Design a protein with these regions (language model features):
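Positively charged n-region of N-terminal signal peptides that target proteins for export
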Residues: 1-5
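Short helix-onset patch at the extreme N-terminus, typifying the N->h transition
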Residues: 6-9, 24-26
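Hydrophobic h-region of N-terminal signal peptides that target proteins for export
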Residues: 8-18
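Extracellular and organelle-lumenal recognition/adhesion modules and their flexible linkers in secreted
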Residues: 19-304
Length: 304
């Protein structure tokens, strides 16, 4: 059943998107390997090697989704971002992600606002070395925010989440699903005694002042009742006030759907980061005296 739902989700995303033509330019030492694949053997140096994506079709004040597949050896931290001029100053917004050993899908979102001459790019932070490959790069204008914007929230073919910080690096895993009503995989969060566990969306997700964010997901505990929480986190660099919306809930031994809604404030003078049009989704297990584990599945994020 989940496989059918996955296909339906991708079909809905395709129907709600407007393809945008892009020109891809790999800068050395990135190499074009053919068939839309680009590779690099990154040495960890302070060179920020990049792939540039340009388009004459990117419009202001629109949301765009960059989809691609990636794989990597090592622990290199790759960035994907959008840069351009805004109000006479250079403005750059980026997302950091890390690929695994096998090709997996990624979906990243950007809000162009009033950005002039925008350029999308990949580059790599100095640090861990590794071999990295990306392929099937595609840029779409997101025409309908009412569809699910987390196509890999079912964890069957990819994972739209990563540990919230290095502290939680070992608390997240994708495992065989424990009797979920569809599909074969679920996300597992595992916490030690007197500790918590938390993941966040890899992508910044669209958030429109005056509109309502709807988050849906299923959860079950491995044993007993575990306190869980979710944040809609609007905190962005360069802004003084940090808006976030917390939700608390209990995770029981049986699968239960959790549905949460939040009307995004329109006061962009107080909460200036809302002008960026983006937020992150965070899901976690609360810090308690007991160790525990919980499973998450069917995560959806949309705007109405």
């Amino acid at each position: 059943m989940k496989h059918l739902l996955t296909l339906a989700a991708f079909a809905a995303l395709a129907a709600a998107a407007v393809a945008t033509e892009i020109t891809v330019r790999p800068n050395k030492p990135w190499k074009a390997a053919g068939n839309g694949e680009y590779t690099i053997n990154f040495d960890g140096g302070k060179t920020w090697p990049s792939i540039d994506l340009k388009s004459q079709e990117i419009k202001p004040d629109k949301f765009y989704r960059l989809s691609f597949e990636a794989k990597a050896s090592g622990a290199a931290n790759t960035q994907t971002g959008i840069t351009g001029m805004r109000g006479g100053k250079r403005s750059t917004d980026y997302t950091t992600w890390r690929a695994g050993a096998d090709y997996a899908p990624f979906n990243l979102y950007f809000c162009t606002n009033a950005l002039e001459n925008p350029k999308i790019f990949f580059n790599i932070n100095p640090g861990p070395a590794g071999d990295i490959a990306v392929r099937n790069l595609k840029l779409d204008e997101v025409a309908n925010l009412g569809d699910n914007l987390l196509p890999n929230g079912d964890f069957e073919n990819g994972n739209d989440f990563r540990p919230y910080s290095a502290k939680y690096e070992k608390t997240m895993s994708v495992v065989p699903s424990p009797s979920f009503f569809s599909g074969t995989k679920s996300l597992k969060l595992t916490k030690s005694a007197n500790e918590g566990a938390e993941v966040r969306s890899i992508a910044w997700l669209p958030a429109v002042p005056g509109k309502t964010i709807v988050v849906k997901f299923w959860a079950k505990s491995e044993n007993g009742t575990i306190p869980g929480y979710m944040y809609l986190d609007f905190g962005r660099g360069g802004h003084k006030k940090h808006l976030y919306k917390p939700y608390n809930f209990n995770i029981e031994p049986e699968w239960k759907e959790i549905v949460l809604e939040y009307a995004v404030p329109t006061d962009t003078d107080t909460w200036t980061a809302l002008k960026d049009g983006l937020c992150r989704l965070r899901i976690g297990l609360s810090k308690t005296a007991e160790a525990g584990a919980a499973f998450i599945d069917g995560v959806e994020y949309s705007i109405k």
